[in-house]
Amino acid sequence: MIKKIRQIYKDFYAEKERNLPQAEKATFLRYCVFRLRYKMPESFYFQNRLYDKQVDPAECLKGTTRVIHGWDISLKRNKPDASLWWRIIHHIDFWFSRFLYPGLDARDYFMYEFYNLKHTLRKTFVTNGYLHQLDEKLNGPANSKERDLIEDKGTFNALFPDIITRKWTVSRGLTREALGAFLNDLDEVIVKPLDGQQGLGIFKKAIHSQEDIDDLFQTIQGQEYILEEVVKQHWQLGRFNPSSVNTVRVYSVFHENQVVITGAVFRLGRTGRVTDNYSTGGMAAEIDVDLGIITSRAVNYLEEEYYVHPDTKEIILGAKIPKWDEIKETVKNAHLRISQFGYIAWDVVVTEDGQVTFLEANTCGGFELQQHPCRKGKKQLYDRFMK
């Protein structure tokens, strides 16, 4: 750790020397505060001349309360029985780690068990802060309207009519009569917020009568929803949990005019749940990108791990993903169509008749699914795309 701090000190003054005389007043201590608060490397600090700005120390440290709160929540969830001595030692270690690995938060620290790792392994993990740097580097500003091409589920579906062939419509401007016509030959429909994330706000509605249609219309009226025909999944995926569509999350990067598949995970829902989302009770397990075989345990947001599905008793480890080569090819071809985005996380499903289709995609797919199941850092894999 001391060696790492010395390296940061050395890098700081090397950058300062390159930016003289404007950076004459830049101090290492002030930079340390910025590094902790804003998770920035030395180059960013100097390139943006943050040493010249009149920064209120109270404003600079405003995030401290949030960080402490995050630590308390993670500690209670992951180490509720930890001794006072353990809590003190590792709380200090956590703050040093935030300095050494910009962007680290308490969830990262506990999820990847930093308290059991040495620096050589800690530095291999992608932190939450690194994710946002990668996202901005490859996809542009987070608030860019262009991201609506992917983040808006209706716009995304319209981009790939040859891949997304199920029936769908959006609630915006939808009349009662148009809704009835859309639902005419459907027994049920899945309803999602147009810009929703993490499986929040999603529900399934059975359609058996005009009363069901009227009830659904009242629910979606004036709201921003996408309504979709329920996907019937391949039996090899559905056997793990029939109540949810169990998806394959594939990560791709557009680099040097080609698409690179950088990772993949299988997401599994729980009995009675409509979605397989990690943040709403689902589980995730790593997939070998070359073989299409699950190579890790499945874990959930609460740090529980499974090698066999707890509800259906299906064996997870070693399971083969159907149509794997076709999944990779479909993702690569789709990414080439929207290559203005450098980093995309695709939610893929194989239908009961073997068609590969998308449920949705995200421009800032988190790394917890890539790193948590296998507890292996993926930073080295992505560093080459940051140059």
Where are these regions (language model features)?
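Intrinsically disordered, low-structural-confidence terminal and linker regions
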Residues: 1-59
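Conserved N-proximal alpha/beta basic substrate-recognition cap immediately N-terminal to
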Residues: 47-181, 331
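Short, flexible loop/turn elements at secondary-structure junctions
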Residues: 195, 229-231, 252-254, 268, ...
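Active-site nucleotide/adenylate-binding loops and adjacent lid/helix of ATP-dependent enzymes
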Residues: 136-248, 255-257
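Extracellular structured ligand-interaction cores
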Residues: 186-188, 245-249, 261, 343-345, ...
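ATP-dependent carboxylate/phosphate-activation module, predominantly the ATP-grasp catalytic core
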Residues: 241, 245-329
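Short catalytic/ligand-binding loop motif for oxyanion handling, primarily in non-cytosolic enzymes
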Residues: 198-202, 272-273, 368
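C-terminal active-site "lid" helix and adjoining low-complexity regulatory extension at the edge
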Residues: 3-6, 305-343, 350-387
